[in-house]
Structures are given as C-alpha cells and as structure tokens.
Amino acid sequence: MPRRRVIGQRKILPDPKFKSELLAKFVNILMVDGKKSTAEKIVYTALEVMAEKSGKDHLAVFEEALENVRPAVEVKSRRVGGSTYQVPVEVRPVRRNALAMRWVVEAARKRGEKSMAQRLAAEMLDASENKGTSVKKREDVHRMADANKAFAHYRW
C-alpha cells in the first residue's frame, strides 16, 4: 500500500451519445477483447429496443433497471479462530453500480434471445420491472447477508 497519498478513482469520460458516465461504464463492462465500438452498438441498439417496448425514455429505463439490481449489502469472508464466517457488510456506492452492471451483463449473456442487444434489452426491461435473473441475484445476496446477520459484529 502506498504511504504517501490515496490514489483517487479514475474519471471516466461520459458516453458520446447520451452524455452519461454510467452508460459509458456499462459499455466498458460489456466490452469483450477491447472492441468498444461493437459494445457501443449493442448497448445503443438495446436502449432503442427498450425505449420502443416500454414507451419510456432510453436512460430512464436503464437507470431504473440498475436501481432495482443494486445491492445494499453483501457478505465477505472473515477468518476468526480457525473458522470462516460470512460477514455482512454495506456495499460502497461505486461498487454497487459495478456489481449491478456486471450482474445485468452476466444475466443477459445467459438468456436465449437471438442477438446480444435483444438479450440485454430483455434483461434490462425485466430488471426495471423487478424481475429477471439479475434481480434474483441481488435478492440472493441480500438473503445471504440477512441469514448471516449474527456475524455482523465481526465487521472490519
């Protein structure tokens, strides 16, 4: 660990089309093998499909979907006296967004629709309506944290 100063978070340039930093981060998470233009095309197509199906604004549906997937608490392993406990800890805001986006992309990749854009749009629409695999993942994480509430005093 550096002793001098804390190194800050790198600033991410906002997305060129919608001027959203959150969307730019999402594109980066979706990107495979450095193919950013392909990832952007997929995200923009998915946003168009979402806006068409829901009748709402592109970014509104996107943000609502992420809001429904963001975890408030998670469990971290902590070793105490030879046994490992799953300790519930609060999730920092930056990590909340990162986890939510990662879960949405993961869930979309496992779906059955034809193109990635369609899969992503379907998963986002499901997430905005509080259903779908990514929301289930968040519920599982919350349930795990709730089940291990007894070990909360081991927080660090």
Curated annotation (Swiss-Prot):
Keywords on record: Ribonucleoprotein, Ribosomal protein, RNA-binding, rRNA-binding, tRNA-binding
GO cellular component: a single term: small ribosomal subunit
HAMAP family, alphabetized: Ribosomal_uS7_B
Originating gene: rpsG
Pfam families in alphabetical order: Ribosomal_S7 (PF00177)
Molecular function terms, GO-annotated: rRNA binding; structural constituent of ribosome; tRNA binding
Entry's family note: Belongs to the universal ribosomal protein uS7 family.
Domain of life according to the entry: Bacteria
Function: One of the primary rRNA binding proteins, it binds directly to 16S rRNA where it nucleates assembly of the head domain of the 30S subunit. Is located at the subunit interface close to the decoding center, probably blocks exit of the E-site tRNA.
Protein name: Small ribosomal subunit protein uS7
Organism: Vibrio atlanticus (strain LGP32)
